[in-house]
Amino acid sequence: MKMDLTGKRALIAGGSRGIGLAIADAYAQAGADVSICARTEGPLREAEVALKKHGHKVLATPCDLGDANAIKQWVEASAKSLGGIDILVNNASGFGRTDDEAGWAVSVQIDLMATVRACHAAMPYLEARGGSILHISSISGLGASVRTPPYGAIKAALIEYTQTQALSYAGKKIRVNCIAPGSIFFEGGTWDIAKRDKPELYERILAGIPSGRFGIPEEIATVATFLASDLASWVTGQTIAVDGGPNL
């Protein structure tokens, strides 16, 4: 069986690096036209060049995902350019690194409300012919975590939101699922920085992964491609942990 997305139109919020870029790349390889957005122009342009090598349509748009109007404009412009929307991936995160007003505010706005707003903006297009919504949460949302409270709490909210949406939209032929990644290593990412600046934390987290290594973005992208494809046509409301087994 082949995970085929030929003819699909996919939007990936937070798609210029790491997990988001890996998902966009996997979707393009599977035949989809893709639209990505992120805050920073430089990585977006690099991602655009890489994605276009697969021969499908690629849009790369700077977007402040804390701005409700900017999200709506990105979704609507993407739908117009691609001819519709079949897949929406919400991957952006503010990371909520501090347990204070600022940390909670960024997690609520970027991890949660940007997701809600993108879903609202995309819904008319998804309802037109059915489709798939995918939220990227975290294993920090599945239980107690070394992360700060805002990050884990809002990632947990995404898991509940997935279930509620799946129940609400099943009759409209829209599937909603969630991936909870574990510790994912990529250049310039959280664990790349920790390896250099906080080696004790890096080694402690690594020691807690039964698989003996950090994951890579492509391992999340493989599951994301399955969930977006027709092979997962009867899968909805699920959160899949892709984590190497630390919670076993």
What does each model-identified segment do?
Residues 124, 167-168, 233:
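Alpha-helical segment proximal to the catalytic Tyr-Lys
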Residues 16-17:
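Conserved glycine-rich cofactor-binding loop
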Residues 1-6, 143, 224-225, 236-248:
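Short C-terminal tail/terminal secondary-structure segment
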Residues 138:
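Residue(s) in the substrate-gating loop at a strand-loop-helix junction
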Residues 119, 154, 162:
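Active-site helix of classical SDR
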Residues 1, 49, 53, 171, ...:
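A glycine/serine/threonine-rich, flexible loop-to-helix segment
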